[in-house]
Amino acid sequence: MADVRYYGTGRRKHAAARVFLVAGDGKVTVNGRDISEYFGYETLIMTAKEPLVLTETEGKYDIMVTVKGGGFTGQAGAIRHGISRALLQADPDFRGTLKAKGFLTRDARMKERKKYGLKAARRAPQFSKR
């Protein structure tokens, strides 16, 4: 009998993550590499694994992630969102816990566009009185 796979899609900024959960011993693979090898920074790894720590399921699932787009911070946030959604599929009782922390909500904040006449989104050129 094949193992049951749980799936979740996560997004943050310009990053999109496809997350698969399978019963296992807690291995997290991101784009074919170990999570610590992929990110390198402990803070990003902690961000991505937050839903597992919160629901106390850290050693219960093997996680395979494919993530594209954005930078490392956006990708870590997308993985967190995807893992949360997949955990919800695995056990609907986690909804209250995950929702209270805001892990099920897509973070809609995006980079503000640059406007013409300005140097950046809001940065104006230096003003000279004379």
Swiss-Prot record:
Disulfide bonds: none annotated. The keyword Chaperone does not apply. InterPro entries: Ribosomal_Su5_D2-typ_SF, Ribosomal_uS9, Ribosomal_uS9_bac/plastid, Ribosomal_uS9_CS, Ribsml_uS5_D2-typ_fold_subgr. GO terms for cellular component: cytosolic small ribosomal subunit. One of its GO terms (biological process) is translation. The keyword Cell division does not apply. Keywords: Ribonucleoprotein, Ribosomal protein. It comes from the Bacteria. Gene3D superfamilies: 3.30.230.10. GO terms for molecular function: RNA binding; structural constituent of ribosome. PROSITE patterns: RIBOSOMAL_S9. HAMAP family: Ribosomal_uS9_B. Belongs to the universal ribosomal protein uS9 family. This is Small ribosomal subunit protein uS9.
